[in-house]
Design a protein with these regions (language model features):
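Classical eukaryotic N-terminal signal peptides for Sec-dependent ER targeting/secretion
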Residues: 1-63, 71-76
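Exposed, interaction-prone regions of secreted/extracellular proteins
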Residues: 54-496
Length: 496
């Protein structure tokens, strides 16, 4: 009862704070408009001056608390009410809250109370704390699920100090918030969504969702026949490697890769740069595409900063009405108290310096059919089989690579960087990379992807490109196996 009262009190305080900040922004906007009028009497001007003097401390307080760029519009009372209602739905009472040095708040939420379980298809769903089976490859065995679920011995980030032919030095992985503490057993680590997060979004209804895909293709018909869903005429550009459709190979039940982590520059506030893997099935030209995605992204609009962050996404209808980023809608069931999806990753790579990468694995549990995600040796959670149509069976294609959005600001190509912001030819410690590409087969075994089994695609190689290669030391576990370098600076003399 005491815990419930405390949770209710904290929730009310957050609500009052959000309303104060939103109302302050609205009042400030109205005052700014008033300053442009020249028909005020002297007394009116004095009155308005007093009003500004009263509001100024509130504005300063709002800026200090939020530490966010000013918005171009004021929220109406109706929008404010919708935002608060949405926040009440997705931010669940926390057993413990941890303030991160990057400005985030991580809530330790009781696993059974998480927002992910509120999907209508998951009514009565019993949380699977660990998968019945994990992928295997020869002598390789995935770290014990129970130990990973308990949060012990995490080594999620690799530091590579020399070149791809030498052994890597393993370092303990950190998300930035870990410096502030850890969540207790029985809870899951959830990044708290704020009013500022939602005010940056174009609409409350589509908060946390990707834009709907444009059916217009930007590639020729021959390539479109096998093209991945990301190849579209909606301003998105990519440098990716992808497997052939399942008509040319065996069905796929998962994928794995180790991804170099950078902090690319983003030119526009609504731009982004990401590096991820896609697990796909369904029609690329219809509305039944199923997709599971995971990687790192820099998105000022979604997170309010330029830090690289672990992210996930899912859809079962080609990004129309289902799915979302991270835990911003019901569906993904989190099991980890150590990894917070949407939290920033630290440290990151530097040109000519230490290179940091992270390993992601997504696979379908052959017994229950759920699609699990691991980050390094940590189980993060799963997408229940009920969420999907085509992926309830298997995947038909896997993709790995980078993506940016080009809104052509000022009529020229965006200068938003992909990967490290360097072209593939610059190689190790300059260009970003994906290494040790693997897929999971019907026997739940990891298999190295042959170099000739993947194709590459870059819509505009003068802006962002990709080069694949193979390191034959991969079989010993010391090399990079099938890998590729990718990325670029965007706008440059050859990319006007």
């Amino acid at each position: 009862m005491q815990q419930h009262t405390a949770d209710s009190s904290r929730k009310k305080k957050r609500r009052r704070r959000n309303w104060l900040l939103l109302s302050t922004r609205s009042a400030a906007q109205e005052e700014g408009q008033g300053e442009g009028q020249c028909c005020c009497s002297q007394s009116q001007s004095q009155s308005q001056g007093h009003k500004l003097m009263i509001m100024s401390p509130l504005l300063v307080l709002a800026l200090l608390i939020l530490a966010a760029p000013p918005l171009a519009f004021a929220a109406s009372p109706r929008r404010m009410a919708r935002i608060q209602s949405h926040l009440d739905r997705i931010n669940k009472p926390a057993v413990r809250s941890i303030r991160s040095a990057d400005g985030d708040t991580i809530d330790c939420v009781a696993a059974q109370s998480q927002h992910g379980l509120e999907h209508p298809l998951l009514e009565g769903h019993a949380i699977q704390t660990e998968p019945p089976e994990v992928p295997r490859r020869g002598a390789f065995r995935f770290p014990a699920a129970a130990a990973a679920a308990a949060g012990g011995g995490a080594t999620n980030l690799t530091k590579t100090t020399t070149n791809s032919n030498n052994n890597n030095e393993r370092l303990g992985a950190w998300q930035t918030w870990h410096h502030g503490g850890h969540c207790p057993r029985g809870t899951v680590a959830i990044r708290r969504t704020t009013a500022e997060d939602m005010l940056r979004a174009r609409s409350v209804a589509r908060f946390g969702r990707k834009k709907k895909k444009n059916s217009k293709r930007s590639v020729d018909a021959a390539r479109a026949a096998n093209a991945p869903d990301v190849v579209s005429g909606n301003g998105h550009e990519h440098a990716i490697a992808y497997t052939a459709p399942s008509s040319q190979q065996q069905p796929v039940y998962g994928a794995k890769a180790t991804i170099n982590v950078w902090d690319p520059a983003i030119q526009e506030s609504n731009g982004f740069s990401l590096s991820q893997l896609w697990i796909l099935s369904g029609s690329f030209n219809g509305s039944d595409l199923n997709s599971i995605e995971a990687g790192w992204q820099v998105s000022p609009e979604l997170y309010g900063d330029s830090r690289p962050r672990l992210f996930t996404y899912w859809t079962s209808d080609a990004y129309e009405a289902t799915g979302c980023y991270n835990a911003l809608c019901p569906g993904f069931v989190q099991t980890s108290s150590r990894i917070a999806i949407g939290a920033s990753i630290s440290p990151v790579s530097s040109p000519g310096g230490a290179q940091y990468d992270m390993t992601l694995l997504v696979w379908k549990d052959p017994k229950l059919g759920n699609w699990w995600l691991s980050y390094g040796d940590q189980l993060v959670g799963y997408w229940p089989a009920q969420l999907f149509t085509h992926l309830s069976d298997h995947a038909t294609m896997v993709e790995w690579g980078g993506e940016v959005v080009d809104t052509r600001p000022a009529g020229v190509h965006t200068a938003t960087q992909m990967g490290s912001g360097r072209f593939a030819a610059e190689g190790f410690a300059r260009a970003s990379y994906f290494r040790n590409l693997e897929t999971v087969d019907a026997d739940n075994s990891l298999a190295e992807v042959p170099l000739d089994a993947i194709q590459t695609l870059a819509e505009n190689a003068a802006c962002y490109d990709i080069r694949k290669a193979y390191d034959d030391a991969g079989h010993s576990g010391a090399g990079w196996g099938t890998h590729f370098y990718y990325g670029g600076p965007g706008h440059n003399p050859a990319c006007p």
